[in-house]
């Protein structure tokens, strides 16, 4: 609840410069695993209009749309394009609650008022609370725009989902419109009743009956602490029914001068030797939100207003591909309800948005099909002759006809399973993130390695041969018998110094024996985008991932994973804005890790 309140205040503070409607989301075990929730580091979001353009893009030309070349570095463009693309993403604050909870009970325990039409039990093993922004330029919301959500982990891995604004807003906008109409009608009725009441008050002496006016005058003339007798007259007016003690008590309660204690010319009792006994509000809490003057009266804090109004609706929203389901909390006192936002939901724009979305996600399948076509092209070119490139002992009695059948079925199975988790995408992502600066850094490291060392100038080059250098590859393991594909497995590859064949190990240094299993085929992709389609026995089809026909912007939009962007509004607990040390998930992150 604190995360949502803080984010709502942050969105309200910068609404004039960046018009966004806050969406308060809750992610649970249906979206993330327990390990993913506990290690989550960054939450990013961006808005894409119906034409597929990221809103809020930095000004610049469209040189990004040039088709990519064979060289992956040419496909990524320069640092300027990378920086322009990075600005379209915004970072959101979040909080991880790593314990089981029931959502509505948790909100009530936090002090919120929950007024739902139909309450439902929402059990969560853990929860991630965050707030994303939906752009509304000129107070106009379009149901055809798309909200992209990206979760990033410390190792650089990330997951993306896309949500249509129509699914997020349609029911809430209709409900908010009904609430505003009901509130307007209620206010109008109160005004009518108030005007009628004022008219009665102004002419009460003329319209009320004479008996009622007489009784009203009698009640006003009678003191409050003097009890009337049965005849309607006061007993303190000389009828002798009350004793002298009772009369003195009545005068004491009435506040006569003789019963008031006067302290004399001393200071007021709230001061001792000139010092205030009661601390002012400004001394107790200098960050009090409504403290314009120390002697002003206390006003209701925004937190109390937020809790008192509470939650009005809880919605479940699916992403465009119906892979994950999020929950959206709509608060009564969220600032956007007073902005009179207009909502447009046109079918034509919705179809345009879906077409643009399909074009964006088609980039990964274009890459996958390009790799498959390249494998078949190499097989036709070489006439089916494959060299052994990976170390593996092969029996002489091995049936190669079965291997070729296995290759065909394995490729079809891999095509059905491959997605953004594939080894191709994992090898491509770092190159897109690094840009031209990374290319210059690699060239500098290569020059440093090739330059002669001081000891080599004095004593000559060393003849001793050290262990072979390992490279980090990614693999897609196709298990034909199980009809299962393990995507994006990270491995370590090094050449055997005796045979020159590749030896593959896992991250712990254990030898991978996939090639010795007759039902397994493996696709390896190197950081330079060279790939090996390996059959049982270590015989491989080798080539390069071609990037012809793909726009640079489409590549970056879909696969780019940039470093952390320092954004405002990251301090959940302290309520401050210090981008140097952002605090997320309840712990402070060192600046060196960003």
Curated annotation (Swiss-Prot):
InterPro entries to which the protein is assigned, alphabetical: UL17-like
tRNA processing in keyword set: no
GO CC term, one of those recorded: viral capsid
Subcellular location: Virion; Host nucleus
Biased composition (Acidic residues): 61-76
Keyword DNA repair carried by entry: no
Alphabetical UniProt keywords: Capsid protein, Host nucleus, Late protein, Viral genome packaging, Viral release from host cell, Virion
GO biological-process terms attached to the record: chromosome organization; viral DNA genome packaging
Family indicated by similarity: Belongs to the herpesviridae CVC1 protein family.
Subunit structure and binding partners: Interacts (via C-terminus) with capsid vertex component 2/CVC2.
Protein's UniProt name: Capsid vertex component 1
Natural source organism: Human cytomegalovirus (strain AD169) (HHV-5)
Gene: CVC1
């Amino acid at each position: 609840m604190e995360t949502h309140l803080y984010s709502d205040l942050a969105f309200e503070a910068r609404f004039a410069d960046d018009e966004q409607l806050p969406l308060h989301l809750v992610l649970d075990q249906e979206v993330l695993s327990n390990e993913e929730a506990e290690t989550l580091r960054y939450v990013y979001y961006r808005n894409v209009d119906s034409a597929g353009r990221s809103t809020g893009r930095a000004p610049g030309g469209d040189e990004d749309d040039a088709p990519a070349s064979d060289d992956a570095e040419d496909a990524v463009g320069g640092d300027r394009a990378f920086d322009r693309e990075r600005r379209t993403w915004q970072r959101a604050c979040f909080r991880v609650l790593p314990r089981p909870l029931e959502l509505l009970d948790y909100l009530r325990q936090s002090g919120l008022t929950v007024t739902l039409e139909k309450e439902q039990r929402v059990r969560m093993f853990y929860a991630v609370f965050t707030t994303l922004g939906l752009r509304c330029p000129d107070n106009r919301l379009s149901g055809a725009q798309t909200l992209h959500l990206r979760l990033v982990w410390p190792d650089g891995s990330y997951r993306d989902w896309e949500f249509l604004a129509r699914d997020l807003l349609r029911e809430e906008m209709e409900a908010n419109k009904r609430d505003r109409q009901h509130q307007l009608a209620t206010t109008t009725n109160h005004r009518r009743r108030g005007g009628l009441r004022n008219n009665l008050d102004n002419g009460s002496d003329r319209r009320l009956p004479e008996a009622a006016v007489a009784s009203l005058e009698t009640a006003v003339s009678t003191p409050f602490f003097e009890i009337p007798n049965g005849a309607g007259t006061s007993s303190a007016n000389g009828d002798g029914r009350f004793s002298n003690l009772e009369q003195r008590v009545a005068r004491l309660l009435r506040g006569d001068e003789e019963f008031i204690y006067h302290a004399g010319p001393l200071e007021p009792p709230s001061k001792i030797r000139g010092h205030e006994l009661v601390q002012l509000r400004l001394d107790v809490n200098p960050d009090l939100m409504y403290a314009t003057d120390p002697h002003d009266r206390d006003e209701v804090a925004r937190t109390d207003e937020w809790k008192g109004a509470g939650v009005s609706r809880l919605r479940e929203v699916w992403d465009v591909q119906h892979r994950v389901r999020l929950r959206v909390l709509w608060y009564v006192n969220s600032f956007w309800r007073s902005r009179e936002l207009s909502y447009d939901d046109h079918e034509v724009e919705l179809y345009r948005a879906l077409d643009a979305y399909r074009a964006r996600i088609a980039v990964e399948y274009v890459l996958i099909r390009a790799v498959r076509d390249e494998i078949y092209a190499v097989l036709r070119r070489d006439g089916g002759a494959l060299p052994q490139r990976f170390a593996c002992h092969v029996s002489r009695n091995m049936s190669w006809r079965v291997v070729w059948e296995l290759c065909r079925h394995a490729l079809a199975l891999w095509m059905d399973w491959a997605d953004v988790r594939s080894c191709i995408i994992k090898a491509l992502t770092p190159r897109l993130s690094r840009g031209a600066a990374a290319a210059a850094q690699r060239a500098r490291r290569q020059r440093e390695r090739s330059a002669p060392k001081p000891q080599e100038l004095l004593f000559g080059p060393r003849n001793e041969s050290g262990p072979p250098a390992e490279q980090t590859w990614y693999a897609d393991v196709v298990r034909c018998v199980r009809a299962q594909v393990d995507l994006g497995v990270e491995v370590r590859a090094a050449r055997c110094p005796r045979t020159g064949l590749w030896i593959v190990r896992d991250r712990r240094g254990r030898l991978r024996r996939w090639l010795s299993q007759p039902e397994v085929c493996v696709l390896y992709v190197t950081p330079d985008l060279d790939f090996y389609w390996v059959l049982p026995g270590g015989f491989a089809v080798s080539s390069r991932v071609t990037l012809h026909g793909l726009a640079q912007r489409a590549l970056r939009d879909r696969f780019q994973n940039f470093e952390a962007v320092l954004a405002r509004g990251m301090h959940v607990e302290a309520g401050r804005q210090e981008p140097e040390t952002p605090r997320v998930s309840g712990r402070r992150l060192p600046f060196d890790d960003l």
